[in-house]
Amino acid sequence: QVMLLERTAWSDNAVTAAEVTGLQVFRDLFAREALRPGEEIEVGSLCVLFTDLLESTRMYREIGDARAFGLVMQHFDVLKRHIADEDGALVKTIGDAVLAVFRRPVSAVRALLKASREFAEPAPGGRPLMLKAGINYGPCIAVTLNDRLDYFGSTVNIAARLVGLCRGGDAVISSEVRKDAEVEAYLREARHQIEEVRAALKGFDQKHFDLARIVPRWAMAKSDLPSTPKTERF
C-alpha cells in the first residue's frame, strides 16, 4: 500500500519567477537566463521606473563628447546602485534613458529620489544633473529581447509617457503609485512638494489620467518653472 502526501501551500521560503527576475543580483549573475524565443509570460504586477537626463544634448555640446559620455556612464552607475539598494533591477538603458523594475512602488520612489539628490548635489567641481522620471505600477509581460529579459505592456508604455510630462528634477507618478499606502507615508514624511496633474497620454487618447508630480525639496529651491496647469496633454 502506498500513501501519497502532497502539500499545496506556498512555502515561506519560495519566490516567484517575477520576483527573482526583478532583482539586480539575479540579472548580474544570470544575465543570459531568458525565455525561449517567441515566448511571453505574465509576471503579475511590477513597478516600472523610466528615467531620462534633462538637456543631455546641450551637455555634450558644452563640455565635449568625451566628458559628457563619462558623466552619462557615471549616472548609469549611480542609478544602478540606488536601484539595487531598493531591491530593484535595471532592465536596460536606451540612450540616456533607464528602464528599471521593482516589486514595491515605494522602492521605486525612494531609489529615484536618492539618485536625484546625488545628481543635484555633486562633489565640488562636479556638474549637477537633472532627471526626468515616470513611475507606474501594474501588470507586465516578460519577453526575451536581445538575449535578455525585458518587460512590455500598457504599464510600461504609460511609465514611458509620464517622462514627457516632466520638466526636470521632478517625477510624474500614476494614481496606482500615488495611492499606495507605503508611498503615501514616505512622501508625507519626506515633505516633498506634490502637485496633482490630469493628463491625456499619446496612445491612450480616450482616457485622461489622474497623476501626481513629485518636486523634491532640493529641486524646489532651484526651480524657476511655472506652476503646474490642472490639465496637460502629452
Question: For the regions a protein language model found, what residue spans apply to each?
Answer:
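Regulatory cytosolic signal-relay segments
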Residues: 1-44
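Intrinsically disordered or compositionally simple regulatory linkers and C-terminal tails
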Residues: 21-32, 214-234
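Catalytic beta-strand-to-alpha-helix segment of the class III nucleotidyl cyclase homology domain
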Residues: 101-206
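Catalytic NTP-binding/metal-coordinating core of nucleotidyl cyclase/transferase enzymes
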Residues: 20, 32-111, 118
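Flexible glycine-/small-residue-rich
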Residues: 7, 50-53, 137, 213-216
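Short hinge/gating elements
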Residues: 6-13, 97, 144-148
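PAS-family sensory/regulatory modules and their coupling/dimerization elements
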Residues: 1-13, 198-204, 208-210, 215, ...
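A structural signal for short, hydrophobic beta-strand segments that form beta-sheets
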Residues: 4-5, 90, 193
